């Protein structure tokens, strides 16, 4: 039989436990419902590893760009009175899905996984628990060539990064393709760069609201991959964006890459071409815009694919443009003038940046075989990827990447075309961008990612592909059910720590003394760190010879031989005319001679 004292103790304990549950419940609800400048939002707690992360998915940050707002800059939101239920991802922005390899995980993983809609301007926030105070914020911008992409892909899930590094992770949707980048420069109804202005408005939202989530608006790092990295570097160049963030991470992309920004004339020509295809050729811009706004978005999607010739690969149909507003000049010019945000940057590339593009139409390439191509197929590939380059220019590439090496291996042409595309489009522009930054005394860090994921569904010959460092940045190998190796989990934790340290302190080494310290990148020695499942190593001057070819030699070849094809055509036409004249003269002379001989016999 229990004593009276024991009963009292049990009652006290039960009351204490009840009070603890109630307080805990109240505290949890307080953390899950946050008051933003536009109204309250409700998130949800997610179990992550041995703890919890609170996720807010699908928070609106702009008015839906529908009807008369199509093609315009994003508009500020009005307030709402109810609690916004931010517990599932929102719509993805309209885009053409990749249908090249139906059902294949390697391509399907990048396709949108939520409904497509023009009502797509939403963002996501992951915060560690308990809710932090003044935590560093990392804002992710997805890639996709400015034509595709969505923040809801599993590979962009911010929960592991938030949990392990106790940072706040934010991602946003932005408009892509013609709906995001159609441009009639100078016309406020279709200014161009709408997708970039979407991103910029999301950055403003973070500045106004992130403190309510426990974040520090004065410690905000942008990070992105491919066109997302191109976007990040454009924010570094844009005076309007510069006050909205602190640091920047560029993964396999930069704004000075040949695909990143197009000229005003090219942007307008593509707009008028799309208008023609879609039946909106009108007498003036006002009528064109009115017609385009009345078209079904699916019709716009189908026709925007036709704007660039189908035999041209690695092209951006609609992308960033120098509008005099978001972007005041071409990135190369702004870099030369030093007109960019003075801050710290972390930049890097993957070992085999080119292979991801080869299986989408390069002659002789396939994901289903070893793609051992011939010299002729290599030359045909150069024609496709360098459509405006003279034959002399293409021969210079062939000589430098193949003939000069005297490589006798069967795979030499395959590997050479991978290197050509990777160096020209990704690696050398990224190195040039980093060099220009560091020359003005800004701290820069460069990495070379060389680990091929054990879960990669693409064939072995494609190597360490474009885009496949992202899963390690976001901590996917920490999910035990996915069967990554232990070494890959360690690599992922290391990369997350480097990224978070950089975001917090401007230095990936953080405040700890690691066994291998990541040195700053200087224009003189160009030190960089390898990231792999073994041990990181420091080297200097990544692909320096190849990048000198692209930055110094190749432009001179184009300058000297750019008109040779045209000159040759003119010469051939002239020769043909001369040859015809000569044949005509010869016929007339023969006729004259025969008549003369006839006359002589009379």
From Swiss-Prot:
PROSITE patterns assigned: CARBOXYLESTERASE_B_1, CARBOXYLESTERASE_B_2
GO MF entries: acetylcholinesterase activity; cholinesterase activity
Record-annotated active site: 226, 353, 466
Record Pfam families: AChE_tetra (PF08674), COesterase (PF00135)
InterPro entries: AB_hydrolase_fold, AChE-related_enzymes, AChE_tetra, CarbesteraseB, Carboxylesterase_B_AS, Carboxylesterase_B_CS, Cholinesterase
S-S pairs: 93-120, 280-291, 428-547
Binding site for substrate: 144-145
Main location: secreted
Signal peptide positions on this chain: 1-28
Root EC class: hydrolase
Phosphoserine: residues bearing it: 226
Protein localization: Secreted
Residues bearing carbohydrate: 85, 134, 269, 284, 369, 483, 509, 513-514
Entry keyword set: Disulfide bond, Glycoprotein, Hydrolase, Phosphoprotein, Secreted, Serine esterase, Signal
Function: Esterase with broad substrate specificity. Contributes to the inactivation of the neurotransmitter acetylcholine. Can degrade neurotoxic organophosphate esters.
Homology family: Belongs to the type-B carboxylesterase/lipase family.
Name of the protein in question: Cholinesterase
Taxonomic source organism: Felis catus
